[in-house]
């Protein structure tokens, strides 16, 4: 995976930070790690930082990723406001009732929403 994963032990969420060259494949790999970690720890919230990743992949891969975002989990995504890839994935996920939201401002706002969102 092109990026880093850390745990916020106090607030109990995973933080994913993707590098500029990351693709949808890296997202899928991170998702598998998150699902495994969630099963082991019960953590079901993630802060995902894709601000340095303007492009992620072909539309079909983006659609499949958005479609396959797990239910019963919450994802706050720090994004670049000019990334159509990120907006597309959010739209696909929201249309399927997933708890995902893009944030273009401060990380604090994203974390606040992440912690307030019901699971």
How does the language model describe each region?
Residues 1-119:
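Amphipathic, Lys/Arg-enriched alpha-helical "gate/interface" segment within cytosolic domains
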């Amino acid at each position: 995976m092109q990026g880093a994963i850390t745990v916020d032990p106090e607030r109990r969420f995973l933080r994913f930070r993707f590098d500029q060259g990351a693709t949808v494949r890296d997202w899928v790999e991170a998702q598998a790690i998150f699902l495994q970690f969630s099963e082991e720890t019960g953590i079901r919230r993630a802060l995902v930082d894709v601000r340095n990743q303007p492009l992620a992949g072909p539309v079909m891969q983006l659609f499949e990723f958005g479609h396959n975002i797990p239910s019963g989990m919450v994802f706050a995504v720090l994004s670049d406001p000019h990334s159509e890839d990120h907006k597309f994935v959010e739209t696909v996920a929201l249309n399927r009732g997933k708890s995902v939201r893009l944030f273009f401002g401060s990380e604090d706002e994203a974390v606040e929403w992440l912690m307030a969102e019901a699971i």
